[in-house]
């Protein structure tokens, strides 16, 4: 990606005293890709944490020469005979993506942009990459994100360890880690009082991993992603009960998880197979079971899908609240949906 924003020239990069440098930075800054980071060099990161708490840090590497097969390792953190294992620590290269302005008018809103040329684009550090070994180009900056999940069973004390970056053509570079674990315990995420609801899009997972919707491969791909969400304290399951509830403005639009069938005699039937499969997966395998959020009876576009047996095709009903057709479409569905939810034991935790 080429950044259109001003950045350091080759001459500035070439003045670096050491070809490759590594330091702790701050989690408050997205470091530009093509400029030398503005950091006060430090090889020691110190923080305090409760038992059961997760703490984050960001290191930043910058280099005027290309690095081959760069990778990150962390040691166990030790306090006397007590250990926070390296398995409780995750590290990721931070990947850069192209984005555009959101807050040009300082109103902080989103929406349609009639003239997209008026909104500037830039390269920003955003994605915590799943790639563990990568080449780093000359005259670039590479942030590194570290997360430590202190075990609830950890003993209080000061734990020390190291983060190391290595590469084929570079000597190992080390940073020191020091976590002061206090004698207080944070409850497990499932026991938090805070209500977190980050919408899930299973359709995007299927597209990204190129697997059939609702197949075993699809659920296998979603499992680690949704478990991360559960570990963040997620409370609600996102379900789409109609086609494109948000008019399809996301990269991967939401289909309806419930099939509506208008029979030849004009009566309605409903297939909840996908809805049930998704909800049961999230509840039973992931552990998110406080609430089922259903979207929506009032979509951006007042157009409602159903399969029509008379024409053997999917049709769309254009209607609005107050119309008889709207009352028939939704009233009949809500009665049957309520029956189904009660049979599953989900009625009291479902909201539209």
What are the residue ranges of the model-derived segments?
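Short, solvent-exposed loop/linker segments at the N-terminal edge
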Residues: 47-53
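A common structural microfeature
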Residues: 54-58, 67-69, 236, 291, ...
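Aromatic-lined carbohydrate-binding surfaces of glycoside hydrolases
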Residues: 120, 149, 160-167, 173-352
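Surface-exposed binding patches on compact interaction domains or structured appendages
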Residues: 2-41, 64-146
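Extended hydrophobic/Leu-rich segments
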Residues: 1, 83-84, 312, 316-317
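A short, hydrophobic secondary-structure junction motif
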Residues: 53-55, 131, 280, 332
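Long, low-complexity ectodomains and other extracytoplasmic segments of secretory-pathway proteins
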Residues: 1-44, 65, 170-213
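Extended acidic/polar, glycine-enriched regions
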Residues: 48, 60-78, 131-191, 219
């Amino acid at each position: 990606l080429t950044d259109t924003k001003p950045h350091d020239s080759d001459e500035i990069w070439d003045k670096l005293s050491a070809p490759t440098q590594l330091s702790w930075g701050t989690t408050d800054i997205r470091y530009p890709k093509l400029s030398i980071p503005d950091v006060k060099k430090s090889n020691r990161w110190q923080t305090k944490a409760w038992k059961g708490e997760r703490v984050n840090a960001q290191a930043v590497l910058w280099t005027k020469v290309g690095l081959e097969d760069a990778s990150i390792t962390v040691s166990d953190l030790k306090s006397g005979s007590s250990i926070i294992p390296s398995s409780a620590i995750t590290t990721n290269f931070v990947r850069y993506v192209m984005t555009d302005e959101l807050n040009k008018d300082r109103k902080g809103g989103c929406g349609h942009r009639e003239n997209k040329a008026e909104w500037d684009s830039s390269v920003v550090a955003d994605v915590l990459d799943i790639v563990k070994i990568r080449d780093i180009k000359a005259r670039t900056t590479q942030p590194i994100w570290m997360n430590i999940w202190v075990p609830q069973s950890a003993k209080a004390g000061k734990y020390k360890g190291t983060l190391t970056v290595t590469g084929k053509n570079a000597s190992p570079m080390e940073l020191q880690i020091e976590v002061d674990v206090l004698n207080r315990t944070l409850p497990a995420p499932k026991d938090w009082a805070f209500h977190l609801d980050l919408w899930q899009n299973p359709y995007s997972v299927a597209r990204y991993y190129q697997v059939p919707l609702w197949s075993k491969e699809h659920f296998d791909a979603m499992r680690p992603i949704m478990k991360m969400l559960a570990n963040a304290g997620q409370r609600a399951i996102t379900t789409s009960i109609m086609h494109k509830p948000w008019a399809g403005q996301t990269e991967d639009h939401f289909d309806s998880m419930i099939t509506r069938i208008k029979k030849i005699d004009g009566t309605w039937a409903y297939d909840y197979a996908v809805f049930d499969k998704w909800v049961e997966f999230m509840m039973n395998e992931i552990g998110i079971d406080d609430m089922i959020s259903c979207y929506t009876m009032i979509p951006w576009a007042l157009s409602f899908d159903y399969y029509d047996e008379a024409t053997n095709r999917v049709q769309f009903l254009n209607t609005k609240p107050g119309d008889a057709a709207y009352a028939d479409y939704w009233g009949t569905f809500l009665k049957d949906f309520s029956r189904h939810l009660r049979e599953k034991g989900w009625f009291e935790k479902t909201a539209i």
